[in-house]
Amino acid sequence: MTDFTAKAQCSFTDRYAPKKDQLINISEFEFRNYNEDTDFSVINQWLSQSYSSYWGMNELTEDQRNLELKNTAHKFGLVGLKRGKILFYTELYHPAKDEIGEHYPVQEGDCGMHLIIAPVDIPEHRLSQNVITAISSLILEHLPFTRLVVEPDIQNEKVHRLNHLIGIEYSQIVPLNSKTAKLGFATKSQFLQSQGKVSSMKNSSKNPSLSLATSHLTTEYWHKANQHLIAKMITELSHEQIITPIKLDDASNAQAASWCITFNSDTGTSEYLFRARQYQLDHLFVEPQSITCTKDDKNQPLDAVSFILSCRHLLEISDALLPTYLEEITSTLYSKAYKLMHQNKTSAQLANASYQEIEAAMTEGHPVFIANNGRIGFDMLDHVEFSPESGQSLNLQWIAVLREKTSFAVIESLSYDRLIFDELGQSQLNEFNQQLSMQGLEPSHYYLMPIHPWQWREKISRIFAADIANQYVVPLGTTEDKYQAQQSIRTFFNLSSPEKCYVKTALSILNMGFMRGLSPYYMSRTPAINTFIANLIETDPYFAKKQFFVLKEVAAIGYHHSYYEQATRTDNPYKKMLSSLWRESPYAPDQHGNVLVNKQQKLLTMASLLHVDDQGKSLISALMADSPLSDHNWLKQYMDLYLQPLLHSFFAYDLVFMPHGENLILVLEDNSPIKIIMKDIGEEVAILNGEKTLPNDMNCLAVDLEDPMKLNYILLDIFDCIFRFIAPLLEQQTQVSESDFWEIVADSVKDYQQEHPQFDAKYQRYDLYCSSFARTCLNRIQLNNNQQMIDLEDREKNLRFAEDIANPLALFAKTHRII
């Protein structure tokens, strides 16, 4: 690898440029630093000729060109030599310091590139291709960059063809001051694939891609990741009454108090000191930077895995499951360090970012679960390629599956043919059908379906080998559409055509207590369930009044593997490996041409509200600051849109969703909330009335629970899992105190109940102002069984509880309760 001077605090040029007299040999070329004294006269002649017009320097004077080529802190030039003669010049630059950086979220390790090749008297076969390939190799294999960025003129077809040959994938057209450009990217993986080097990427211990996949594992980022996760462990394990911190002083909530936790074990006594504020719902808001650790009175570095081992006797986790849990903890730390390194936008900047920019910038994951980024099954390169925080665009793999072995279902207003035509287009559909025909197969005997590239590579190609050999499953390749992984990791948003469907795929990795497969049996019911719920929402004028909508899962497909169907009658991950579904996009027009989101509005998942940047500033406070509404009115409007429709679902229909942050999309205008869109309906909705008459194919929705547990769908899922985290952020960073927050919640409940007196009996039966409610402990559930936390057929079986928790709304019972 090239010797370069790389310090994080150095300028782009100091960090990445080769040393002064260094020669870098790649293929038939030598690279060295641009020398103004000896090289400018040569390159100046090139830039004055018409063939170099896309550089925009034809009309400049010699002095102006000389100034443009000078190295700066943010760009440097290299010349390429062949047999000692200068053949080309390339400029490498920092996109964040260039105009192009205003048009996309620049990532750590991005490198922009410009190129000009000397005019030649005698054309040389593939010269331009060989030059651009060598430059790409320099950037992605020899220098420590992770992504090549290009922005050629939209009319420069020659360069577009060359870029395609090095794996560049264009994402968008952008208007620049001097041109209209195509913005494109190539990662190390994409470049190697374009050169046919994929097989060596994962196997060569000397390959730079391996170090790039661990470049975030520095002492600084690892310390911060452990600091963050231990703070979360203290918060959540104390909330679930697994550990009991001791308060050392009597500071008020305006200032954090000092706390202590002591663990005694066979290996010694560990003590953690920290500062934290105490909030409602037994929530400790820990200051991560305040945490210190000693073991037997000796200072220790912060280590989240050691924290777990120190208190393992309190966790009630089996010896068999503990190693897997520790792996999940380590993977979560790995992911956090990656996010810390690549977190390049403040919350204030994200408040004005696009939907997918925000989605890729999220750093926490589920706010309650400690081991929430396990992703067991992904290696380090998979993490870079497929994780939501990498923000990578990718192509989904498509296959054909024999219809007689496949379950396919679609909503009544759609058909398979219409769906596939809308998603693929006629040209791509013809290409796939032609592939089948050329293999002697009848296209009408097959369904086409998208799958996750990792799932194809790691699972389907091997476990379904017999089906592939027998042409029950036929690989077809990829389409041109680019997708981005969402926070839920197995769901993809179409970047190329945002109006097309989300695609949710089976992904056989273990993440947060589940193997993330999709059951083909459940796929067969999914569109009908979505239609049933959507009809209920759409025909009730209250939901329309509150601007509460759902995104339907309009079609679903699942392949049945005959071996595993015979091997086990019970639920099993092997039976959930090959399924996908299509979900409506919020940008898709309805049958009348109307869309949920117009150009003045923007989207973000509700999980984004809890995002905190590296300066400790939350996104929800940044949105409030940028909104014309007061902080209190912003929050009231949010409760009107979010809480009240969920109350109506519960009291009017016994209907509950899983309303956590990733399942809801918040629509904003002027950074004020105006709509709520619920998604992920199929697997995470229930009717809490076992006696309620439902259509035959809807019986799976009925859940028979005791009344207190029904109420937990609001008190736990909304209050404890969402509001518990929002309230402290608002108290610390806005004009909304914690008491203000819960009063606004109580007012919202009261307003709803007064507007709907017909449910008075239910308000008394399900009392939202009750003194306390069941403390359902999600981390205890994961510790009990981190392979499958919840049995969807029996949701209560694996639940774990501690002492009941005080309800913040009880303070308002006398003034707000409907009597």
Swiss-Prot record:
The keyword ATP-binding applies. InterPro entries: Acyl_CoA_acyltransferase (IPR016181), Aerobactin_biosyn_IucA/IucC_N (IPR007310), IucA/IucC-like_C (IPR022770), LucA/IucC-like (IPR037455). Pathway: Siderophore biosynthesis. Requires Mg(2+) for activity. It catalyses: 2 N-(3-carboxypropanoyl)-N-hydroxycadaverine + 2 ATP = bisucaberin + 2 AMP + 2 diphosphate + 2 H(+); 2 N-(3-carboxypropanoyl)-N-hydroxycadaverine + ATP = bisucaberin B + AMP + diphosphate + H(+); bisucaberin B + ATP = bisucaberin + AMP + diphosphate + H(+). Keywords: Acyltransferase, ATP-binding, Ligase, Magnesium, Multifunctional enzyme, Nucleotide-binding, Transferase. Its EC number is 2.3.1.-, 6.3.2.64. The keyword Cell wall biogenesis/degradation does not apply. GO terms for molecular function: acid-amino acid ligase activity; acyltransferase activity; ATP binding. Residues 1-190 are annotated as: N-hydroxycadaverine acyltransferase. GO terms for biological process: siderophore biosynthetic process. Residues 200-819 are annotated as: Bisucaberin synthase. Multifunctional enzyme involved in the biosynthesis of the siderophore bisucaberin. The N-terminal domain probably catalyzes the transfer of succinyl from succinyl-CoA to N-hydroxycadaverine to form N-hydroxy-N-succinylcadaverine (HSC). The C-terminal domain then catalyzes the ATP-dependent dimerization and subsequent macrocyclisation of N-hydroxy-N-succinylcadaverine to form bisucaberin. In the N-terminal section; belongs to the IucB family. This is Bisucaberin biosynthesis protein C. It comes from Aliivibrio salmonicida (strain LFI1238). The lineage of its organism: Bacteria, Pseudomonadati, Pseudomonadota, Gammaproteobacteria, Vibrionales. The gene is bibC.
